[in-house]
Amino acid sequence: RLSPEVRARVQCAFREKVFRPIHRCLETNKPFWWFTVTNNWNSVCLAGVTGAALALLPDREERAYFVAAAEKYHVYGMKGYADDGYCSEGVGYYNYGFRAYILLREEVCRATQGKVDFFRTPKFVRIAQYGKKIQMLNGICPAYSDCRIGLTVDWFINNYCDNVLGTAPYFEKCVFPSNGRNLSLYSIEFFPNQAWKLEQSDEIKQAIQEEYDPLHTFYEKAGILVARPSEKSNCDLAISAKGGNNAENHNHNDIGSYAVSLGRETVAGDQGGPFSYPGDYFSADAPDKYPIKGSFGHPVPLVDGLQQVTGARAQAIVLNRELTRTKDLFSIDLTSAYNTPKLEKLLRTFTYDRTDVGSFTVEDKFFANAPIRFETALTTSADWKQIDANHLLLAVGNEQMLVTIDASGEVELTSDTIQVNGPAYTRIGIILKKTVKDGQIRLIMCPKRP
C-alpha cells in the first residue's frame, strides 16, 4: 500500500496537472483542442481524464462535473466514424481509439449505474460491427491509412461488443495484455463478464438485425468494399477496395487503393503506415517526402508523372456497384484526384470473382485531350519475379499469385524499394511505353496452385 504521504502527493499532482487545467479551460469556454477533435485523441484523452477523476476525486459533485464533460464532448470523437460505422483512421486506430471509447463508456456507466450510456445510438452498433465487417479472411484486414501491415481487430473489442449487444455466441474471455501495452487502456481485459449490457431499444434492435452478408461488406459513406469467398469453396482469395477522398483522418492520398489476401497472407496491395512516425510525417509536404504516405507508395496510377492531390476535392465517385453470389464489381471515377488539365477521365474498375480458385482484376481506363504518360503500380512485400513481358509471379509463405498485365500498348516495368520506419516493400511500376491520349491497363491476379 502507498503511504499517506505518497497518496497526498499524487492527489496534489493530479489536481495541479490535470483537474484544475481541465476545469479552467472548460469554465472559460476554451476547451483543449482534443475535446472537439474528431479522431482517436478525443476518446483516449477523455477516457484518461474521466477515469482519473472518478478514481481520485472524493467529492461527488466534482466527479459529476467530469462525467458531464465526457457526456458533452464524447460525441466529437464519434464524428470521426462514418454513420455506417466505417473508421477512416484504419484498423490500428480503431483498436486504440474505440478501445478507449469502450473504457470511457464503462467508466461512466458504472459511475451512473447505467443512467448515462454513450452506446445508446444505432451508430454505435454499426461502429461495433466494423471489427468483423472489415476483415477479409482469416482475420486479415486491409492496411488502409496509418494501419500497420498485418494488424487485425483486437479480439477483446469484438468480444466486448458482442456481449454488450447480446449477440455473443460465447462468454467473455479474460485476456492478459502483452508486455509493453498501456495498462490504463488494457487492464479492462483482466475482468471478463463485466461488460455493462446495452438497453435494447427498438432502434438498437433494428440496427443489430441489419443484414450482414458474409460474402461482402460495402461501406457506402466511405466507398469501401470487402469481398470474401464462399464458405467451403476452393477459393481462399479475398480483397478490399477503397474509394473515399483524400481529406480523411490519416489519409494517404490513395483513393483507388486495394488489398489482396490469399489464405493467411497479404499478397499485394496497400502496405499500410509506418510503425513509428517521422517528426514531420503530418506536415503538408509529407506525401511527397514519404512514399508510404503519398500515391507513389500505393497501388494507384500516376498521371503524367503526377501523384494524387491532397484534400476533399480528390473524391472517388462511385459509378457502379454490383454485388452477387459469384462476382462483385466496383467502379469509381478518379479524375478529380489528379491536377492536370490534360486528363479528361480516369476510371478504375475492380472485379472480384469468387468462383473456382478466384480472381481479382483491377482495370484503369483513361481519356486525355493531349498525349500523356500513364503508369499504374503493384505494391507488395512478397518475393516476386517477372516471368515474361506480361506476367509476374508473387510468392509469400506457402502462397503464390500470378499477375497478368493486359494493356492497350507495350509496357515497361520499374522496381522501387520503399521503407519508412517499417517493413520494406516493393513498388512495381507498370508504364505504357508510349504517351497516348487514351488507353487502359488491366491487372488480373489469380492464385497459382501446384
Where in the sequence are the language-model features?
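Catalytic Cys-His active-site segments of thiol-dependent hydrolases/isopeptidases
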Residues: A268-G273
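Carbohydrate-active enzyme catalytic cores, enriched for enzymes
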Residues: L56, Y96-V267, L323-T324, T435-V436
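Short alpha-helical segments and helix-capping/turn motifs at coil-helix boundaries
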Residues: F35-T36, G243-N245, A286
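Aromatic-lined, polymer-binding surfaces characteristic
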Residues: R1-Q135, I140, C147-R148
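Short acidic-hydrophobic surface loop/beta-edge motif
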Residues: G51, L225-S230, Y258-V260, K385-I387, ...
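Extended glycan-interaction surfaces of carbohydrate-active proteins
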Residues: R1-K30, A55-G80, I157-V175, G180-W196, ...
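Residues embedded in well-ordered secondary-structure elements
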Residues: T38, H216, A247-N249, N253, ...
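CBM-like, beta-strand-rich accessory domains located in the C-terminal region of large
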Residues: V175-N182, P274-P450
